Amino acid sequence: RRLAARTVANRIAEELKTEPGGCIGYKVRFSDHVSDNTMVKLMTDGILLAEIQQDRLLMQYDTIIIDEAHERSLNIDFLLGYLKELLPRRPDLKIIITSATIDPERFSRHFNNAPIIEVSGRTYPVEVRYRPIVEEADDTERDQLQAIFDAVDELSQESPGDILIFMSGEREIRDTADALNKLNLRHTEILPLYARLSNSEQNRVFQSHSGR
């Protein structure tokens, strides 16, 4: 979520031809790029919860957008409940809840039959290739790595595009990145991405590269 807040703020600032921290700012843990001139602030749910402790009526905001509301978490559930209770005391406050997969009718009823606005998105063709890991093998971790190696090799021969690999945790990400680096893949840079990386290390995934 911290990475998303930073990158979305940077993208909006770029679209408006301004620098982050000006009219477009963001605030995440350990990083506050907000000024007196900030009109749009992107933040994590944890930051908004912390602000509620000091500003229970959220008077510094006239509009709050809760994005990806379907990603259920204790923070999001608490915020949605709190904002519903806050609206009678802040009738001027506008709440916008966005999601691609929630039940809009149910959310509308929860917020006193709030209007529903549907925005059509762009769809892309998706091809699914199933490569099962051999279940009889004793070394499951090695089988998983070999399956990743095979998939990377297969994709490298077909398209110049980047390859995104999802892993279950930080350790698995680091181990897989180390293993891929040992392959010395041509024109390929291996970039791990997880929450504990520094901002500069996370931002490397958005930088252009001559290869993949």
Q: Could you tell me what each predicted segment is?
A:
Residues 2-212:
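P-loop NTPase motor module signature
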